Amino acid sequence: MIVNGFIVMGVSGCGKSTVARLLAERLGWDFLDADDFHSSENISKMEAGIPLSDSDRAPWLALLNEKLISTLAAGRHPVLACSALKESYRTKLFHETNGLQLIYLKGSYDLIWSRISQRKGHYMKPEMLRSQFEALEEPVGALVMDIRLAPKEIVDEIIKTSNFNPSSLSSQKPT
């Protein structure tokens, strides 16, 4: 498959936004953070420590899918940071898209807990991490990256192992 974009997935605190932003910068592609697309109601629930239900997520996933489709249709290349914890969520994200590669940032509960408990100013509370691990359905066919690696190393490996259309990399920055 020729890669036209990426979805970088995993539980909260695994480094999705950091890796996706760095990857987008390296490739000259469009960084999208799924957190920026949550409704105020969803953010309020998460701030209160209430895990989102599938029905809470449905409009958010539809909006993300529309954004992926419109970005690709405009000839751009999206790099989306999104939890995408369940297979059904990933199916909705990938609907009517072509060439998106799924990257799964995998790490232990203890490592991610240590990261998320140090994070300041994020609406996702550390106490909700357990619910994310419980909801997580590990993906099949994703490029799995060990989050013990530094973000730059993860991005280097993604770029090295992905099959790009050379014209999509015309603005790639040197490493």
Model-derived regions, located:
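Conserved lysine of the Walker
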Residues: 16
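Small-molecule kinase domains that catalyze NTP-dependent phosphoryl transfer to phosphate-bearing small molecules
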Residues: 118-157
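Conserved phosphate-donor/acceptor-positioning beta-strand/loop module used by diverse small-molecule
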Residues: 96-115
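Walker A (P-loop) ATP-phosphate-binding motif of ABC ATPase nucleotide-binding domains
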Residues: 5
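Loop/turn-to-beta-strand initiation segments
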Residues: 74-78, 101
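P-loop (Walker A) phosphate-binding loop of NTP-binding proteins
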Residues: 11
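Conserved substrate/cofactor phosphate-moiety recognition/catalytic segment
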Residues: 21-66
